[in-house]
């Protein structure tokens, strides 16, 4: 059944929390200020241009805003009439019980035909899916609660089971491995599964950097660099229209479409 595969020896794994703290430390070293637990209350504009933001009752004057609020980006942008075609879907994975003699250097394996991915996780195996027909999150409303940062959905093993069966067929070691954790949580996606970058057409100096389609840990550094260059120079010296938010029309962010 397996005709061949592609190995990328330069790939690796990273701790998301560690990477986040590293980037935050680097930003602070360059003079950036970071305010946690500070929800955006209002985006301020004047004459069709960004003028500031209101956070925790405090008005902060600014010339530019970069919206990088993950799955909350769409509803934040809506407050000022900006269309961001982003939708949260339910994402599933399981973590097995510990497996004896499991290699810590097991490659992260993507089985595109069966929509699964498999990787080592502290002596256990994680099996996740990126299925073609996913389940819309939050009852198809696309309204993400403000306090849902680490929230989970009820288990849906009926939806996950066919993909697990395919994974077991590909990796028989899973057949006798118990399941320690079944995770179901939201992940936001764009209609074409490409990132949303660049200045929005509705408001000048309003940039977006969101819709990373569950590959933020791998592409975050690159999209951050591109966004910074774009913001500082007003253009980018390469063709990245496939990521430019202007590739979409207003109707693309309507619930009936996404």
Residue ranges, per PLM feature:
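Active-site catalytic microenvironments for nucleophilic, acid-base chemistry
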Residues: 26, 30, 79, 226-234
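Helical element adjacent to the flavin cofactor pocket in flavoenzyme catalytic cores
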Residues: 6-64, 68, 72
């Amino acid at each position: 059944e397996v005709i061949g595969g592609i190995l990328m020896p330069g790939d690796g794994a990273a701790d998301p929390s560690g990477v986040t703290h590293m980037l935050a430390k680097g930003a602070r070293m360059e003079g950036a200020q970071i305010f946690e637990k500070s929800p955006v209350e209002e985006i301020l504009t004047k004459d069709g241009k960004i003028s500031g933001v209101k956070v925790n009752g405090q008005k902060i004057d600014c010339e530019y805003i970069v919206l990088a609020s993950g799955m909350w980006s769409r509803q934040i942008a809506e407050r000022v009439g900006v269309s961001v075609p982003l939708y949260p879907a339910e994402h599933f994975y399981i973590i097995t019980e510990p497996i004896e003699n499991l290699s810590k250097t097991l490659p992260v394996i993507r089985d595109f035909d069966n929509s699964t991915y498999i990787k080592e996780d502290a002596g256990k195996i994680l099996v996740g899916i990126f299925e073609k027909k996913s389940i819309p999150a939050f009852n198809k409303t696309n309204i993400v609660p403000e306090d849902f940062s680490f929230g989970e959905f009820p288990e849906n093993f009926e939806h996950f089971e066919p993909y697990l069966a395919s994974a077991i067929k590909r990796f028989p070691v899973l057949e006798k491995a118990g399941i320690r954790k079944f995770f179901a949580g939201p992940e936001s996606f764009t209609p074409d599964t490409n990132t949303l970058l660049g200045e929005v057409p509705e408001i000048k100096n309003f940039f977006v950097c969101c819709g990373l389609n569950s590959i933020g840990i791998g592409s975050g550094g690159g999209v951050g660099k591109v966004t910074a260059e774009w913001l500082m120079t007003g253009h980018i010296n390469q063709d990245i229209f496939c990521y430019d938010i202007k590739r979409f029309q207003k109707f693309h962010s309507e619930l009936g479409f996404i």
